[in-house]
């Protein structure tokens, strides 16, 4: 029984479950998607909240530029570039047997400090917590030069506090590195699928890593328990945190500026499609919220998940969100896309974004590795498996038979003028030997 219903009843009510349970690559275009002006109200956060987060990151820029010299060139702003992918675009055009528009890569894989999209939300939340503590203690003023936080005295102050998080890898890396640098005692609770090199890197930064034999949800639960037992411990809640979400959302306006600088037009006649790898949902949900604020109905966001971990698709499609885990349906949550190995989605994100996300699709590990090798071969970009989940998105949109494009007014003419942006979530910090093994596996599939 699953939530009081036998499996057969679930399958009869939601025929799509047959595809998910069989681990087949699946696409579902959301019939409930609504105009941004209407659906943004579901989120419970506003453009003013995102502007507040953006201003906070600007206040911290002098600190980051000093504490992390790799951010000095960008003045302490943690941002990634966008890159056209002409060779991959040509390959996908062949596969689509028609015009697809322009293909771009968003290189969060190369974000400074922790080399993944989690450098956005994770670092932001810890900075916000540090600011709150320092302001309350009278050690910092909003108009001060925040570079003053990079001092022994401030590290000693933060050393009286703890930060904890549960993670499959990249969020833990971001939280651990920034927390330790500020002076916090940091603990990362890591699930069984976390890569060894991520654990090693955290320990090298003086972070306590607690390992679990079970999956992501257990690691998060243990982190939450640690924080509940200690009033001086801040738990970064990947499933429910509004601060994480806002840290990611800042990306929307920045991308608008980047595309404008690259002379890429985004409007109803030139739609923008953004393909976001999805684990628990905080990163893609926050980014999509920021994108909807920046571009309104001209942007179409899709979430991509591994066939073995389709937690958000399952939760939104059934409307039961975090009440369901993929394991309830015999789906094992085992994937090489470690950052996406999540069995139970964020209910906050699922509900907040369910009328703003155009579609959800799943990708097999084989396809992730195939695209990993192809992108390296054609464009010279080295990405981790999770980061490739967005690559087949354009083919899913052009190949759908659910009436989605017709419903959204996405005519062949508009599709030919579209921009497709694949959000590459991580990869630059993967050790060379591990990357070589990824590439070898992918090349066997070409």
UniProtKB/Swiss-Prot annotation:
EC assignment: 4.3.1.18
Entry annotated with the keyword DNA repair: no
Entry keyword set: Lyase, Pyridoxal phosphate
UniProt cross-references to HAMAP family, sorted A to Z: D_Ser_dehydrat
Catalytic class of the enzyme: lyase
Residue numbers bearing the N6-(pyridoxal phosphate)lysine modification: 118
Co-factor requirement: pyridoxal 5'-phosphate
Similarity annotation: Belongs to the serine/threonine dehydratase family. DsdA subfamily.
PANTHER family: D-SERINE DEHYDRATASE, THREONINE DEHYDRATASE, MITOCHONDRIAL-RELATED
Name of the featured protein: Probable D-serine dehydratase
Highest taxon above the source species: Bacteria
Naturally occurring in which organism (per UniProt): Ectopseudomonas mendocina (strain ymp) (Pseudomonas mendocina)
PROSITE patterns attached to this UniProt entry: DEHYDRATASE_SER_THR
GO BP, sorted A to Z: D-serine catabolic process; isoleucine biosynthetic process
Cross-referenced SUPFAM superfamilies: Tryptophan synthase beta subunit-like PLP-dependent enzymes
Annotated Pfam families: PALP
MF terms (GO), sorted A to Z: D-serine ammonia-lyase activity; hydro-lyase activity; pyridoxal phosphate binding
Catalytic activity entry: D-serine = pyruvate + NH4(+)
